[in-house]
UniProtKB/Swiss-Prot annotation:
GO terms of biological process kind: chromatin organization; regulation of DNA-templated transcription
Disordered: annotated segments: 162-207
Annotated function: Histone-binding component that specifically recognizes H3 tails trimethylated on 'Lys-4' (H3K4me3), which mark transcription start sites of virtually all active genes.
GO function term, MF aspect, one: transcription cis-regulatory region binding
Zinc finger (PHD-type) residue numbers: 211-263
Domain of life: Eukaryota
Protein name: PHD finger protein ALFIN-LIKE 7
GO cellular component terms, semicolon-separated: nucleus
SMART domains: PHD
Residues spanning the membrane: none
Amino acid sequence: MDEGGGAGAAAAAAGNAAGAAVHHNARSAEDVFRDFRARRAGIVKALTTDVEKFYRQCDPEKENLCLYGLPNETWDVTLPAEEVPPELPEPALGINFARDGMIEKDWLSLVAVHSDAWLLSVAFYFGARFGFDKEARRRLFTMINGLPTVYEVVTGIAKKQTKVSNGSSKSNKSNPKPSKQSNSNSKPAKPPQPKDEEDSGPEGAEDEDQAYMCGACGETYANGEFWICCDVCEKWFHGKCVRITPAKAEHIKQYKCPGCSSKRSRE
């Protein structure tokens, strides 16, 4: 349900009906975290890989619009729910009004911050609704805190936490990481290469837990996955998140992620 617009009924589907599935089926911190992670993935997608579509849908001429992350990892830009009080906490109203009055990256960062607050409010709403005790709330928060925030993904802070070294060749199979090809054309990366032995000490191991986060979904690198690096912003992406296969990457001389491509088209 990536297409925006619609009326209050669409908002109900985005927020209330979507939350009903969690309400009836989930009773554990792990279930609520799965819902949080899916909604977060949808919002990250709206603000990164689908940013051009998201930008168009946030027309300042329309009424107060909200960005919803849905439990199926998609997103929706629509009006808030009509019922008062709403079944679920509502996201920030009127995100579209500030679109043309701000630098685009600042506007996206603002939406990201409000989205982080909304995601937390929905997760802990479910926690209260299901009667989570102190330990369940702590477990839920710990799992949530293990992911970078939407703001960190959108602004690139998550990526900057650890510098990516180019062209590594020595192997340490226990600490794999993506490796960008070091040729002059900066072609997209092949499946990630392992980590240098010299970086495998305690400090390197600590950084490894936070490094190599996908610029689209925010998830960390897992051994054997195909990743690709944008030659403009130098963010890494799962091939599946940006619809690039290893075969397709072979024929790309300079790869631009969806965010950089759409930004240049609007300049």
